[in-house]
Every structure is written in C-alpha cells, then in structure tokens.
C-alpha cells in the first residue's frame, strides 16, 4: 500500500511539471510569432523610410519679394546744423536808465517793433536846448539880412563905405553857417531821443532778456538787451564729400531748385523741406568736404538754431529702375549676389550690380529683371538648386518666437 501511495505522488508531480513546461513553451512560441511580423515590417520599412527622408526632408522656409520697376530718387546725404538766417544782438546806442521792456521772451517780433525804452528826459532837454539856439540864430540871421539890404541901398549913394558893406555881407554868411550847425545839433538831439526807444532791427524770435528794467545801460555794453534770431526763414549748413561736388554742380545747371530735406537725429522723421541756397567757395583740406547751405521757410517752427539734423538733397531721379529689398542683396567672394527663385521654388545664385540703395531698397542695374523673385529672409540656409518653401512674413511674431522658428528650421534643413 505504501509503495502504491508513493507512486501516485510521483505521477502527480511529473504531470504538474509537464503541464508547466508545456505552458511556458506555448507562451514563448506565441510571443516569437507576434514579434516576428513587426520586426519584419520595421526591417522592410526602415531602409525605404531612411532613403525617403534623405530624398525629401523638411523644406527650408524663406521669405521672398518680387523685383519691381519704378522711379528711384537719388539723394546725397550729410550731417548738418541749423543756423539762424540772421542773428542780431540788440544793444542800446545811448546811455541811460532802462525804463521798460516791451517784449516777451521767446516771442516773434517784426522789424521796427518797440523792444525797450530808456529814460528820455535828458534827451528831451538837449533837444529843447538845440531848438532854442536854432531859433535865436535864425532871428539874428533875419536881422543881419535886413541890415545888409539897407547897406546895399546906402552904398549906391556912397553913404556907407565898401568896407562896411563887405563886413555886413560876411556877418550874414557867418550867421547862415551858424544856422546850419544849429540844425545839425537839433537833428543829433532828435536822433538821441529816438534812440532812447529801442526797436527790432530784423524779423525774428527774441531770446532771453539780458538786462532788467531799472538798470543803467550804455552803448558800450557787449551783452546787449536781447538777442534776435531770424528763423523765418532759417538755414541749414551741412557737409558733402568733395567727390559729390560735380554731381551738385551738374544738377544746379539743370535750372531747377534742388530740394533739401532735414531729418531728425535718428533719421526716422522728416522735419522740413527746403531748397539749396549755395555751395561754399572752397573745400576743407582737412576733411575733404565742402559746406553746403540750404534755406527752409520754417513756418511751423520745426527747426531751431544749433539743432543737429541729417540732410538729404535730391539731385536726380532714376527712371524705370529695377528695385528689390535691401535685405535680399548679399556680398560674397565673387561680389554682390542675390538668390533668385524659379517657378518650382528652387533657388539659384545671381551675381548683380547694385546702384542707389538705402536701408529699405536697392536698385539693381544688372543681374536680374523686373518680375524676378528674390529671397529676403532665410538666406543662410540656401544652397545652389535647393528647393525651398516660401512663407509669409509674420510681423507680429515676438523675437523669442522668431529665434525658436529659425532654430527649428535649421534643424529641419540638416535632417
């Protein structure tokens, strides 16, 4: 019985072990079958996918613009300073006490406007004295002329000598000379009185007063009472390289006034527009430049004396010029070039000859034609014959977003 019991346990253990072994064998076989198709598919797809990625990776995004034909003005530029057309220091021409000022600091005045008054008392007294002396001498002259007339009648009958007649004639002439001197004295006294009223010699803007009412002033004071600057019109003096002189002279010979624009310090806002007035008569040998003067009406008071401005003078207009954005123009070992897009959005490098240009646009004199598309952004990622994706500019994009998109594009171009 004991032997039979042990045999049964042995059989049970063997069956259990066999069942476990069968389970693990079946499970492993199913896993290998399910993995094989995936591995085979991946092995089949990987080469093809890799080759396809090599052939058609992400296209480099670029921005483009079309070359257009238009009239382009040619400007000569220089740095300049605004100066008053006239600057006058108003001084007193007589000595005396300042009684009144008749202007507000900073106001515009006209020539002849009353600016200040000096105590006129002494000048009125002097005028009255000279007028009295003149009246006295006129009376003396009248009496001398009557005596001369009588002497002339008596001389005809020899009742007076020739010597007495000549003496009376001399007295009349002497008195006439005295009268002329008296008249000059009266005019001088009147002038001194007039000068006690100080008027504006020119139109312009008055500055800050240099003296207060009540002070004793004299004709020898160098500071004066106030300074007037004529700002309507106002002038601009700027410099140009000596190489531009021929261009300016040629433009002047055309007979039309040359337009000069005044721009602010940042060169972003036009302040006023005037015309060329004159060229200096010599070149500065130290700087190789020549001074140029322009005049502006300045009715809006946009320009002030000693103001620093950027000057632009229009000397010519180039008609039917091919124009592209300045950002499209590049410089390489072979010279200036642009990337041109064809109908399939493939790029090719074109050597060009640039002309007039500024911060926004440039004239292309040779190398491309109007209607050609040129790349303006994304240029650093281009190679000859590469196909690109033309995208629209997003002006609202923040600098951080632009940096991120550019880095992503570079990664895409390299992948």
Curated annotation (Swiss-Prot):
Transmembrane segments: none
GO CC terms, sorted: efflux pump complex; plasma membrane
Main location: membrane
Cellular localization per UniProt: Cell inner membrane
UniProt keywords, alphabetically: Cell inner membrane, Cell membrane, Membrane, Signal, Transport
Disordered: region residues: 32-60, 392-415
Gene3D superfamilies, alphabetized: 2.40.30.170, 2.40.420.20, 2.40.50.100, Helix hairpin bin
Induction, per UniProt: The mdtABC operon is transcriptionally activated by BaeR.
Basic and acidic residues: bias regions: 399-415
Bilayer topology term: Peripheral membrane protein
UniProt entry tagged with the keyword Signal: yes
Signal peptide segment: 1-21
Molecular function as annotated in GO: efflux transmembrane transporter activity
InterPro entries (alphabetical): CusB_D23 (IPR032317), Multidrug-R_MdtA (IPR022824), RND_pump_MFP (IPR006143)
Subunit structure: Part of a tripartite efflux system composed of MdtA, MdtB and MdtC.
Protein task: The MdtABC tripartite complex confers resistance against novobiocin and deoxycholate.
Family designation: Belongs to the membrane fusion protein (MFP) (TC 8.A.1) family.
Stored HAMAP family: MdtA
Protein name: Multidrug resistance protein MdtA
Organism encoding this protein: Escherichia coli (strain 55989 / EAEC)
